[in-house]
A protein has these predicted regions:
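Activation-segment/catalytic-loop signature of the eukaryotic protein kinase fold
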Residues: 119
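Conserved short submotifs of the Hanks-type protein kinase catalytic core
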Residues: 123-137, 141
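Activation segment signature within eukaryotic-like protein kinase domains
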Residues: 184-185
Length: 367
């Protein structure tokens, strides 16, 4: 459905009924010429200003899109490395799949999903232009270094509040308080639900792919591993620590696999530790993931363990058998056992906070 209109009504008038302005004829002719051409083109130069990250697929740089009249827009450029491909043909085929997914993600326009601007090539090397997300990814945010930075910049009263409502130290890394962790999880579920409705699986949900923006919102980023269920990639890649058991076993990665990955991230946020730290082999990871639901009371803090609703929600995300997980991301949020019910529980107990604003203030204190 088209939502953009081209208006050809009467010109703007002043209060006495006369035309508000008289545009020069030459300028009007240029305007009409632009419209009559029915196409536009211009040259764009993007400078690789700063490395934002690197991984198995390539590197991501901060850049700027420059326009006229001193307009600039920060953007992120992901440059896909061919190193993992045996031939140019394999690289081209893989990039074609990624481009198809990127085009569909660009049309979803969901607030908690990364916006994709373009997919281009330079000397046959593919580059994806994306929005630059100003904030912190969870992997970087949940470090003792940033927790200490926060402590050094706030008053004793504010520090006590942060520890009670937002974040506190955990066994191996900072842990988020349940209300904040669930607020982030709900926004991630909204992003996954939008993808899954389009039959797209993210395929790599992990802390470094979840950004907290300075607005206080969460956003799932890096769709380089995402794929359409009708066009499965071979071979598939994953981050073993956050991959669902069925993925480690070589079976299909499905929308429920994304839920398991998000569940592992949630447990890490709540526990202040990575539950699979130190495990190096697939066999060790598989065994640990099958045992994780039983081990939750041992690794989660008391304030979580004593909340039956929250414990059942965690188990509904990470169940080793995908058929025992929530049926989809929307259900994980909205069912009686879902994340929304826990937030309603906090509200009834007068324990809730304006979490979006709390995150925004916290990130401001880190700068």
């Amino acid at each position: 459905m088209s939502t953009t209109t081209y208006y050809q009504g009467n010109p703007t008038l002043t209060v006495d009924g006369s035309p508000a302005v008289r545009c020069p004829d030459e300028l009007l002719e240029r305007y009409r010429a632009v419209l009559d051409q029915q196409r536009m083109s211009w040259t764009e130069h993007l400078h690789l200003a700063r490395l934002l990250g690197s991984g198995g697929q390539g590197v991501v740089f901060l850049s700027q899109r420059r326009g006229t009249d001193e307009f600039t827009l920060p953007v992120a450029l992901k440059i896909f490395s061919p190193a993992r491909y045996e031939s140019m043909r394999n690289y081209d085929e893989a990039m074609g799949r990624i481009a198809q997914v990127a085009a569909r993600v660009a049309q979803i326009q969901q607030d908690n999903l990364l916006d994709v601007h373009n997919f281009v090539d330079r000397h046959r090397i593919r580059i994806m232009e994306m929005e630059w997300v100003d904030g912190y990814d969870l992997q970087r945010l949940l470090t003792r270094q940033l927790l200490e930075r926060t402590r050094s910049r706030v008053s004793a009263k504010r520090w006590e509040y942060l520890n009670r409502v937002i974040v506190t130290d955990g066994p191996a890394q900072p842990r988020l308080k349940p209300g904040i962790a669930i607020a982030i999880t709900r926004e991630c579920l909204s992003a996954l639900a939008a993808l899954h409705r389009e039959s797209i699986v993210h395929g790599d949900v992990k802390p470094s792919n979840i950004m907290l923006k300075r607005t206080g919102n969460a956003k799932i980023v890096d769709i380089g591993s995402a794929f359409e269920l009708t066009n499965l990639p071979k071979p598939r890649t994953c981050t073993p620590t956050y991959a669902a058991p069925e993925v480690l076993e070589g079976n299909d990665c499905t929308p429920r696999s994304d839920l398991a990955g998000l569940g592992y991230v949630l447990i890490e946020m709540l526990a202040g530790l990575q539950p699979f730290a130190g495990l190096g082999t697939y066999r060790e990871l598989l065994e640990a993931k099958r045992e994780l639901p039983r081990r939750l009371p041992e690794i989660l803090p008391r304030e979580v363990v004593c909340n039956e609703l929250l414990m059942n929600f965690c188990r509904g995300l990470i169940a080793p058998d995908p058929m025992c997980r929530f049926p989809n991301a929307e259900a994980a949020d909205m069912l009686k056992e879902g994340a929304a019910s826990f937030q309603r529980q906090l509200i009834k107990g007068d324990l809730a906070a304006e979490y979006e604003n709390e995150i925004r203030l916290w990130l401001e204190e880190l700068d």
